[in-house]
Amino acid sequence: MSPEALSELISSIAHNLVAAGQAGALTDELIPPVDKLAVMRPKDRAHGDWASNIAMQLAKKAGMKPRDLAEPFAAALAEADGIAKVEVAGPGFINITLDSASAAAVVDTVLAAGAMTDTDKHLNKVNEYGRNAHLGGQTLNLEFVSANPTGPIHIGGTRWAAVGDAMARVLEANGAKVVREYYFNDHGEQINRFAKSLVAAWAEANNLGEAGYQTETPCDGYKGAYINEIAARVQAEAESDGVDLTALAHQDQGLNDDGEPLGEADTEVREEFRKRAVPMMFDEIQKSMKDFRVNFDVWFHENSLYADGKVDAAIEELKSRGDIFDKDGATWFESTKHGDDKDRVIIKSNGEFAYFAADIAYYWDKRHRAENPADVAIYMLGADHHGYIGRMMAMCAAFGDEPGKNMQILIGQLVNVMKDGKPVRMSKRAGNVVTIDDLVSVVGVDAARYSLARSDYNQNFDIDLALLASHTNDNPVYYVQYAHARSKNVDRNAAVAGISYEGADLALLDTEADGEVLAALAQFPSVLATAADDRQPHKVARYLEELAATYHKWYNVERVVPMALTDPETRGDDEARKALEIAKNPEPARAAARLKLNDAVQQVIANGLDLLGVTAPEKM
């Protein structure tokens, strides 16, 4: 019996007690929905397989003492099929012990779940176990990473890539249609600074400083070896196309008010670098994402909002709703009407659009585009965007939508890469960039994705490169993957020994260690549902670590494949030890049941790792 089935049984009993007049003043309307009646796993196995606090939840509404209300619940539960024992404990907890056959039914449930048919979307051989449709009918637009195209993806963006894709997979496993979207910021001042930085690098490489060209990176520009590399690529591409950058620079070069060179190439050459370098960065970012197993459905270019008139259209929409006004020569969004702490400029007094104007148009586009309009627009933003939440939610409300429902904003905290016990700086401007490709080259995709997805994005996170590269149980991804590989090895050994679980009697899974594994398997569906509802995919990783620990412990105390005298563990002259080891061998029926349990664990680990975008290895 699964935890969900127990919750449904408890809910049914509550309604029956109301009908029978055994629940005091309680009415059907006061009974919470089933998902609010979840059972818990007792810390002490002596207290049973599951525990419910429903009597304490409902006692006040019923006008009864918790223990007095718990008694009729316990009596009804004790009569249900699959339940071996029920006890009322403490202030009103109801402890439930399942019979072994009922507890073990989860094994059949896991292995009988249908295989996923969209195999091209999965890394592992996964099945439907754990999946549900409670988010069915919803289209969720999940925007993540969206780093500026002014350099390679740094470690902060890498965290969002791992978390965002894992979240998308978890949401899809709960029935939602998810549109993965990357917002490509190819409009605005940061692109201008990027182009200036490239021009300076090009001028320095071509010894144009003496001619009056600026070769120093602008103080607000971008530094790093990648700037020099891209500048050289732009120059080579331009020359191949017959474009003379030096001639363009000479054409641009002007004088300041004192008749001296400006020291900086201007519009023409800078535009040449911009139009060639931005697509180069776009291609590099796309490749990095693909190599990291993140496949976006939409690559949205900010420039298109202006080119297609979407910014003007969105502002007109807000104006028609009475939320736009003019002041001091500028155009403002009256966001204070919708809970923001101050009104926001959207068109400056010089006629230029403020950055927020694009945000307004982008949200409106997500909600009303022809293909896959979003029921919910989820933004995954860095810690430096915390101040944006108020204005974004106000804009959502101004469009007649519900903040927190139609728009959700998730803020991620910082990531530090540790070197010699100290954080490595990660600023693109400092030239000391830790990129997604750097991380993958050191620890691999599996370790990078798992480690970043297993940490709560609401908290700062330190990456220990040495730990992630290690093959020890201290490395979480290794620990979980090893559990899967170990289960595969059990299968291979069982095949050699001629053991099959065909017709296995799962009621023989009656030891304490068996029970712990069974309970862990039964919790996977609720973990998956909670991870989706809470937007916290790290809960899947933490569950996998608990399942792996439970499995490793079970493996060490409950033998699956009989050990023979020829096995390495029983070789040697110690006849007493060999006899003891052989005595531990399970009888064939129990071995078959344990083999089936082994394969159920294997399946759930494969399912869980797939949700994190991590492979489930056959061998390690």
From Swiss-Prot:
InterPro entries: aa-tRNA-synth_I_CS, Arg-tRNA-ligase, Arg-tRNA-synth_N, Arg-tRNA-synth_N_sf, ArgRS_core, DALR_anticod-bd, Rossmann-like_a/b/a_fold, tRNAsynth_Ia_anticodon-bd. The keyword rRNA processing does not apply. It catalyses: tRNA(Arg) + L-arginine + ATP = L-arginyl-tRNA(Arg) + AMP + diphosphate. It is found in: Cytoplasm. A motif ('HIGH' region) lies at residues 147-157. Its EC number is 6.1.1.19. GO terms for molecular function: arginine-tRNA ligase activity; ATP binding. GO terms for biological process: arginyl-tRNA aminoacylation. PROSITE patterns: AA_TRNA_LIGASE_I. Gene3D superfamilies: Arginyl tRNA synthetase N-terminal domain (3.30.1360.70), HUPs (3.40.50.620), Isoleucyl-tRNA Synthetase, Domain 1 (1.10.730.10). One of its GO terms (cellular component) is cytoplasm. It holds the Pfam family Arg_tRNA_synt_N. Keywords: Aminoacyl-tRNA synthetase, ATP-binding, Cytoplasm, Ligase, Nucleotide-binding, Protein biosynthesis. It comes from the Bacteria. Monomer. Belongs to the class-I aminoacyl-tRNA synthetase family. This is Arginine--tRNA ligase. It comes from Bifidobacterium longum (strain DJO10A). The lineage of its organism: Bacteria, Bacillati, Actinomycetota, Actinomycetes, Bifidobacteriales.
